């Protein structure tokens, strides 16, 4: 293993060098079934020939331009995502953590537009939203937060799948402006809420003029049988964050 990599993870003593579909091969030639889909990233498998071809063609044409200019493929993808999600606008960034960071910034902007100087976002126990400072604070796991204090202010934490706890916040907080929640918790243990949970959150957000922001980084792009997990609840959120399978590792 590379001696100059920072020890940010407890890496297993395996190095993969190639993949095909659901299979991976390590540097010793051993074959593995990737039952995790590259931690929910490789929704189309490894080394899909159509994806490899598209990457090669684009690399031969143009790799990067500034977003000061129009980017045709970006516009087409935004149109497609909005069509699938019934949403109106897309903001592209580099990772799931950045997507959730952007959602947090949107909520704060929304709060300030309502003359709330210190807007709060309701977040959940056992959640995971990323490792930037704001998303780390939103994450409901003290283990991953330890050592990075002081954390960012502006979050109110409640138990997952507990509408009464959110109602209590609504009854007692004049600064709350949004709810950030995973439709199904991933890192927290694959916790599936009650069937009426997301619909209940949507109703509470409507009643109090809050934003409902769904972290679909693990559940989005077809992983639950619908393009987005919120489709099962028959609701429409205000903000959706995507990553992982959206890029298939690219």
Show which residues each predicted segment covers:
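Conserved N-terminal phosphate-binding loop of PLP-dependent enzymes in the Aspartate aminotransferase
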Residues: 1-250
